[in-house]
């Protein structure tokens, strides 16, 4: 059990590092690493509704667009402040991940942080976690509250 928790922690540490690297100027985007983090199909649930998709060419194209959006609003880093792993069964866990999105607002140079929590459902086969579902809060609302959009 401890090894699985450590694997999930390392998985999200790598995920955060890839995200922060993609916010640098110039960006270093590890698209293959992001793609490899997800199962062949995955589901997102948010206040906008539930969406599902294939981990395929369209997803691969959307990744750099998402990072570009975060850079446009002043994103500088994606940091993990906590990870709590809940065992579901022998092959699946839920990870509650507390994130800190650090930014410098383009319009006035003010620095700040958007804190939020995502819940990820991961399937672990041969020690390799893959995200097959996640629940996220209202990202657009949080960005509006911080004057980023």
Locate the predicted segments by residue.
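Juxtamembrane and targeting peptides
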Residues: 1-33
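A solvent-exposed, acidic/Ser-Thr-rich amphipathic alpha-helical stretch
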Residues: 2-6, 29-91
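Short beta-strand segments enriched in hydrophobic/aromatic residues
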Residues: 38, 99-101, 135-137
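Short, cysteine-centered beta-strand-loop-beta hairpins and adjacent loop/turn segments enriched
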Residues: 72-73, 101-113
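Hydrophobic/aromatic beta-strand elements that line small-molecule binding cavities or substrate pockets
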Residues: 80-86, 100-101, 116-123
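A short hydrophobic beta-strand element
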Residues: 90-101
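Short beta-strand edge/turn micro-motifs at domain boundaries
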Residues: 113-148
């Amino acid at each position: 059990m401890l090894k699985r928790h450590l694997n999930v922690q390392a998985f999200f540490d790598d995920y955060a590092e890839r995200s922060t690297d993609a916010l640098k100027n110039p960006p270093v985007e590890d698209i293959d690493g992001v793609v490899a983090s997800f199962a062949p199909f995955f589901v997102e649930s948010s206040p906008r509704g539930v969406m599902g998709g294939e981990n395929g060419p369209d997803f691969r194209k959307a990744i750099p667009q998402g990072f570009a959006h975060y850079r446009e609003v002043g994103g500088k880093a994606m940091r993990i402040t906590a990870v709590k792993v809940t065992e579901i069964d022998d092959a699946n866990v839920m990870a509650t991940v507390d994130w800190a999105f650090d930014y410098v607002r383009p319009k006035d140079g003010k620095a700040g942080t958007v804190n939020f929590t995502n819940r990820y459902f991961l399937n672990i086969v041969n020690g390799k976690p893959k995200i097959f579902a996640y629940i996220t809060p209202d990202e657009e609302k949080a960005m509006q509250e911080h004057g980023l959009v």
